[in-house]
Each structure stands twice: as structure tokens, then as C-alpha cells.
Amino acid sequence: MSTGLLAKKVGMTQIFTPEGDCVPVTVLEAGPCTVVRRKTAEKDGYDAVVIGFGVVDEKHAHRLSKPEVGVFKKAGTPIFRHVKEIRVKDAKQLGDLKAGDVLTVDKVFKANQRIDVAGVTKGRGFTGVMKRWNMKGAARDSSTAHEHHRHVGAIGQRKTPGKVWKGKHLPGHYGVDNVTIQNLTVVGIEAEQNVLLVSGAVPGHADGLLFVNTAAKGQPRIKQKQEVRERAKPKV
């Protein structure tokens, strides 16, 4: 079964390996997620599964439209705050999943597996070029104007082309971007607490919503190397 889970970022900590190395890890509350709908190529044009995460009280159901509530009632599941559709190329990747099935962290992932984590970065507001684009800034001597050393400086050329090029790095809004961190490693799994320990940092603030999925680039490359080694072995 190839699918992912919606998760909530709890925070960061560190663990020690048997060799004594200190590894920074991010603690994620991954799932449990419930299958809300199963899409098929025959009926919908593609194979996918829709999962829900974070149960909402019935008293807040009026905030959803009737078609949205109808999807949950048809599946016989609670109303969820977050819903995610996961497409696959082959229906075999989803196995026999159907509406109402519960996906837990130990069913989807395993230790030392490579994963991709997608989320929204922290919002920094309106920032200057030094913070937003890591520019060097001007010389910091006493002859410059007030805070001139943090200004962007010249942004154009001469009479030709006589304009500012599109994409020029300028001050502006920084953060709140969709970012995917690829090829992180699952360090540990606590199935009873639905906890997933991931090596390194992931985007977003604490309590932020994340989507954890099998790595798009990690596993196939390893498999490819194994096939190359098998073909390179001398035939007896």
C-alpha cells in the first residue's frame, strides 16, 4: 500500500544513536486518518484516495456546505477539519482500501524509511532584501544615510533597457510558502501515541498541518542501483 498521512507538527527534540551521535528530530502527530472516499479510474478518471484528519464537533457542521457534509455522511465517517486527496498511478498501490478504513502511522510507514514532508512555512511579514534574499548590504561606515546599509541599492541599468527586470529581488512579503522537504528519514515510530520521529526540520510552526508521504526520489533510486549491481555480476 502506497499512501500518506496528514500530520501535526508537535516540536523538535534530539535523540542519541547507539554510537553516541546526537540526531535532531521533529516530532509529528501523524494520523490516525480515515478514508473518506475511494476514487477509481473507471468512475472518476483516475485512481485516488481521500483521507480526513482532525475530527470536528457536530455543532460546527453548519460551517460546511451541504455537499461537503453529504460526503462524510455517505462514507459513514465523522466530519473532519482537514481533507487530502492522494493520487496514485496504479490502483494496486492502494490495495483494498475503502471508505471508513483507518490509516495509522505503523501501517503506512516503517523505521529508516525515506519520506517527503510538505507544509506551509512560517509567515515573516513584510521584510527587507537582507532577510528575504540574504543580500550582503552596503558598507557600514558613518557616512551612509540612516539604515542605508540595509537598502537594496540600484535596481536598474542605464537607458537600455530602461526598466526593472521581472523577478528582481526586492523587499516584500516573506514566508507562508508551500514547501516540500525531500528524503527525510523516519527515525522512530510510537504507534500507541501516533507519533512519528523524523530526522531534521520540517516547514511550519508548531501545531501546523503537514502532509507526510513516501519519498518520490529516494526509494526508486536505491532500487535502480540494486538492479545495476545485479546486471553487473559476472555470469557463471
UniProtKB/Swiss-Prot annotation:
Position of the signal peptide: none
PROSITE patterns associated with the record: RIBOSOMAL_L3
Key words, A-Z: Ribonucleoprotein, Ribosomal protein, RNA-binding, rRNA-binding
Superkingdom of this protein's organism: Bacteria
GO molecular function: rRNA binding; structural constituent of ribosome
GO terms under cellular component: cytosolic large ribosomal subunit
GO BP annotation list: translation
Gene3D superfamilies in alphabetical order: 3.30.160.810, Translation factors
PANTHER family assigned: 50S RIBOSOMAL PROTEIN L3, LARGE RIBOSOMAL SUBUNIT PROTEIN UL3C
Subunit structure: Part of the 50S ribosomal subunit. Forms a cluster with proteins L14 and L19.
Database matches in HAMAP family: Ribosomal_uL3_B (MF_01325_B)
Family to which the UniProt record says this protein belongs: Belongs to the universal ribosomal protein uL3 family.
Summary of the function given for this chain in its UniProt record: One of the primary rRNA binding proteins, it binds directly near the 3'-end of the 23S rRNA, where it nucleates assembly of the 50S subunit.
Protein name: Large ribosomal subunit protein uL3
